[in-house]
Amino acid sequence: MSDSPGTPNGKDTIRNYEFTPIGYVKERETSVPAVANSDSRKRSSPYRSPAADDDGPPQKAFRADDTLNSTRIFNDSSFDDTLPSQSVMNSVRINGVSDLHDNGIEEENGGASNPLKEQQETLYKLNVENYNLRVKCNSLLKFLNNVTDEGELRKNLAVIDELQEWKGKYQELKKAYRSLQLKFDQSEHKDQADLEQDARSNEKEMRSLQKKLQEYQEQVTQSKKLVESLENKLGNSASGSKEIKEQFEHKSSLLQERIDKLESELAAKDKELEINRNEIKNLQNDLQKANHDSSSLADQKLQTRSKEIENLNNRLKSAVREREAAEHLLKESQNALRSLRAELSTLRQESDRKLDDLSVAKEKSERVLKERLEERTSQSERLQQRANSLEQNAAELSSRLQLRDQRIKALEDEARELQKMNQRIQDLNDGKDSEKLQAQNQKLDGLRSEIERIKNEKEELERDNDKLKKRIVAQATKSPALKANSRKSLEKDAEAEKLRSRVRELEQELRVSKDALNKLRHNYRRDTDELKLQLEGAETDQVSAKRSLEKEIDRLKFEIDSLRESRKDEIAIMENRFNLLRRENEQLSGQGGSQLASLQKSLTEKQKEINELVQRCSDNTMDRLKLNRELAKAQEAESEGKREASKLSARLEFITKEFVKYKEAKTQGGEAGADRLNEKWSEKYQHMKQRLLNELKVLQEENLELERATLERKGSAGSGTYNVGMSSLQDQLDYYRLKYHREVAHTNDLNVMNDYLNRVLRASAQHVRLDILKLENEAPPDAFPEFTYRGRLRFKTVALFVLAAVRVQRVSLKLRWDSQRLNYLQKKIALEQDKITW
């Protein structure tokens, strides 16, 4: 028999406690103390009470309570819906029951007295009481350590008493729970075979379902292949849209005629049905009359009426067959309409593709025209700039020519003066200073040669100017064609550079001539001073000198006037050419505007054609919708007619069966029984007749309402305008699909939350059980050493927290996008429904 547990503060008795300290690892014992009761077994359950073992309080190796850092509940793996195996649960409960039996709790009403057993029980009770007293002492010590000197000791003692009372109640409840657990384990032994059978049947069902899934997957793949082949066929049959459209119109007209014929036939059949119903009513009336006549006459009439009923049944069967034929025709028409719808969809796709091609071609043509206009405007601007630059160059050249003319005139005046002076010197000196005169004559010849050279350069510049003007005119005439503009611009730039270099050379030559003139002036002044000294006394021949000088002046004036007139003509020619260039530029801009106008007209025409095509497409869709509605209504009418015919045939068969039964009963029974049966069947017949009449009235009223509705529909078919498009249907489909996916996701989230809360509740219940066991077998707080790793965050917790934050952010973004999409689709559908004019 085991010793009683020692004091709670003893470090050497920790191994006898139920719970090991947190973080404390038990050392393996080499020798186990002898146990008095060798037959008793230890419980396999982790939750053991003091009454479970004879070795003292039960023991349990417990892990460190890391509830703060533990993320086992929040892992994805914890959301596993699999239940624990039944064998484990049964083993736990069975062991519990066997332990209860071994411990002797259920053996109160045993057989003969056993002194050893009684001693064991008394010792066990004493151990339990001792343990409870120690727990109380420990709890009292805790409370006393925590109590202040403010008079709270009595309150704490009262709380301790209440705790003890509740512990006693808990022990009683625990005993009741154990008894119930025993009963439950006994009942579960019986149910285990049933559970195994259920598991086998479930496995069989799973296998069959997997086979069905494989079959469905194969069917899906086959259907996908069929869809792909059909799509390929549809893509191949896209050619010949106009012929298909004409065929569709022809087929639709034929189908409309066939539908009209079927409606007329249905109306005729309805009339025949009404006639048959009237005949049935008449027959029923005759049957009522025949009931009052003699039995023989009734039999004969019944036979005749039964034959008539059979004839009517045959007629009804023929009518049903005709209905079936009409339904077959309707199905064929529906199939034809479906094929026509497919052709319409292909036509619509082709029209959309053509519209896209037209829009692309229109955009390309607009881009090309814009680029051409921009090129022409840029070329006209360049030509204008070049014309302006050429005008400036011409003005500069004219100003330079005027300056040169003035210089030439001055040089000519100086030459005349020198000639006069030479003549005077010749007259006065007659041979004096011949060397000086020769030098002056040489200088005069040099000046004349320079003047001639300058005149030649002027003529060359004028020729270059004329050439430039001709080139400008040629370029202006060739500008509409826009040929080799870059090359001509380069040539013009090169020519302009040549002209500039030529102007620079002329300016340099002018500078040289200016220097020479300055030198000549200096020499002239020096010579004039010398000549003045020589001509102080020479005053003869002044009249002749004056005349010669006047002649020279008149000649020079004439030359100057001729030069001015020639320049005026050149300026007028330049102005005319400039005006011509301006007019040609205006003509080019006008041609560009006319081309733009023509392009805009062509664009408007194409836009009209596109609008017409769109209108045709919308009309085709409207016709298709009308045909669909009419077909649906015709199908509904056909189905209603079928139902009515089936009901009537069933009722007629029932009536014939009743008549047959009536005949048999009449032949078998006597007259009294026959009278009773006649009364019974007459009442039944009247009741059925009334029901049939009521139903016939209801059906007639429904037929009249349907006919009125069809007539109103036919009358209002031409007046109504529908602007329903496939886009609204697509938007509605997208809206409801998105809403459905959102609801499915919401339900999945709710299921996950529910599972999570269930698992949290289970875990919390498990923690509560563990806390209760701790309170029952309370250990001192000083028995557990302090561990440094307690309360420390782990990398796994931080990583899971970050992952959860990322998932929450993604889900919130997706929800926001879905809500925005739903709002947009809802507004769009509302706007499109507002646009519909019924």
Swiss-Prot record:
Polar residues bias: start-end ranges: 287-303
Q: Which residues form a coiled coil?
A: 163-644, 682-709
- Keywords in alphabetical order, please: Coiled coil, Cytoplasm, Cytoskeleton, Nucleus
One GO cellular component term: cytoplasm
Q: Subcellular location, in the record's words?
A: Nucleus; Cytoplasm, Cytoskeleton, Microtubule organizing center, Spindle pole body
InterPro entries according to UniProt? Spc110_C
| Similarity comment text for this entry | Belongs to the SPC110 family.
The subunit field of the Swiss-Prot or TrEMBL record says:
Homodimer.
Name of the featured protein: Spindle pole body component 110
